[in-house]
Amino acid sequence: MFSISSCRPSPEEAQLWSEAFDELLANKYGLAAFRAFLKSEFCEENIEFWLACEDFKKTKSPQKLTSKAKKIYNDFIEKEAPKEINIDFQTKNMIAQNIQEVTHTCFSAAQKRVYSLMENNSYPRFLESEFYQELCKKTCNNVIILS
């Protein structure tokens, strides 16, 4: 069973999510619904990593940038990390080198891979999920048909 905020998105919002993965991620209800779906599939580490990277890229302070980079690395990248994401060895090594001198782009390659994985794998499953279908069904039931 999925649960998101008690405040539901409008039917129109829910339908927009199927148009593009970016639409889903840009909408707070869409993001919450997608996170709940990923959690139900035991793969929420992907969206959590992606969101951590988005936050990381907005960080201005060099000290905070370094501490956030270490946290992201420890949480998602290093071997046996609690929320280890599924990326190739080469990308992991590149990140390990990149965080020696932290820049806003040190996780870019991994973030792109995770985004692509979610867009091509998790997103289509989300759109076919009972939860999303139920939102769409409610959408159809709320439409007034004029003859």
Mark where each language-model region is.
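Long, compositionally biased intrinsically disordered regulatory segments in eukaryotic proteins
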Residues: 1-147
